Every structure is written in C-alpha cells, then in structure tokens.
Amino acid sequence: MQLTDTWMVRINSNQDLLKRGKWVNLTFTFGIENTDYLIEIINGKVNSIKKRVLSTKSGVFRIHGEIVSWEKHWLKNPPRDYHDIFAMLAKKIIILEGDLTPFIQNLQYFKDLIASNRTSND
C-alpha cells in the first residue's frame, strides 16, 4: 500500500479541514508496515507526501500501524476499535510517538486528515 496523490487532493480540497489546520506547519511521519512517509503540512495544507528514504529524516511525531489496520480504518464504516485513532491507540493497534504537543493541540485536524483517506464504499 502506498499513499497516493488522491489522498493529498482529498485533504487539500476539504475547506473545513484546511480552516481547522490553518496554524499547522510541520512534518510528521506516517507509517504503514515497514514503510514511513513524511507528510509536510503548511498552513493546514499538505504540501508533500514523500516516502522516507533516510532514517535520519523524521517528523515531529510518528503514527505507525500495520497495513491491515489502516485498511480497516479507511473503510467507509470501520469496525469497532478501528473507527478512531484513539480507539486504535488504546487497543495498541497503532503506535504514536515523538513530540505529541502539536498533535494534541490540533487533534481533530489530524484525526480528520487521516480519516479523509476513507473509501466511498466497503
């Protein structure tokens, strides 16, 4: 599974999400299995999603999960424990590490940003 430009378009075309994240300026690491992506956000808009090739490059914080976990989270109607980042965190389905201050300060923004990759059908 790779993160696609489609996800970036969904995020950047969601005016409510952009308004909510207008003060977010950072890069965070999003992991799927053994692959990490650096997601750069400028004023709430995703500027780039790049595969991390050097382990010395990292984001302010990192969210990591297995491919099956993200696939379940991104269903139109996710099953119990996969519907929300914190539910997934509580069940140890995902890992969240690093400086969590900007994540918590902009919690709804990041939850909606990640959920915006949901499919339109199951």
Where are the model-predicted features located?
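Feature captures hydrophobic
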Residues: 1-122
